């Protein structure tokens, strides 16, 4: 009986010790969990505070940058307004005088060049038109065959002027020329010829060759064209090119003068 009582007491003590151990272990685990939750809560709060500080700092930087950009825009607007108020800079009178001299020089050069070109165009025509009258360009003429048989082969022709624009040739006769046994009533005779100048030259030389006259001994043949459309177009193109070159050079000269003036103003 006593031994059973001791066994029961020992067993109760063991059970009580086991439960106390379990309770202590559970209490320790609960304390650890509470500590971990506190740490996690503190970390979360720290992250939240850090994010808030970053957002606030970024907002402050954006605001400062915006204010800086607005200040620069205002400064540019003020500078632009100042430039508009100042207006275009006045050009030095000496620069204007130089430009006027240059314009006059270019105009004079263009006039002289045009005059030379016109002189060269009409020099040959003036020599060819020597001995001709205005009526020679309008009065009716004779056929080419009649001219060869009655005038050319009888040696009564001194010089021939071919006018391609009028489809005719003007033959200037010798003084005292005799035609059909009579003295010629006019100093020239008009020959109707609708073909070109090369063909006219070939026909005249062939007729002279038939009577034994060589190429070097034949009648002088001149070409009279006058102021044709082609010559007029060439003249206009030449004058336009000269004027364009003068304008471009004038712009370059004006730019150089203004740059030099600006450099002198800075110094």
Curated annotation (Swiss-Prot):
Keywords: Membrane, Transmembrane, Transmembrane helix
A GO cellular-component term linked to this record: membrane
Main location: membrane
Compartments where found: Membrane
Protein name: Uncharacterized protein B0495.9
Transmembrane segments annotated in the record for this chain: 101-121, 226-246
Domain of life where this protein originates: Eukaryota
Membrane topology: Multi-pass membrane protein
Organism: Caenorhabditis elegans
Disordered: region residues: 58-90
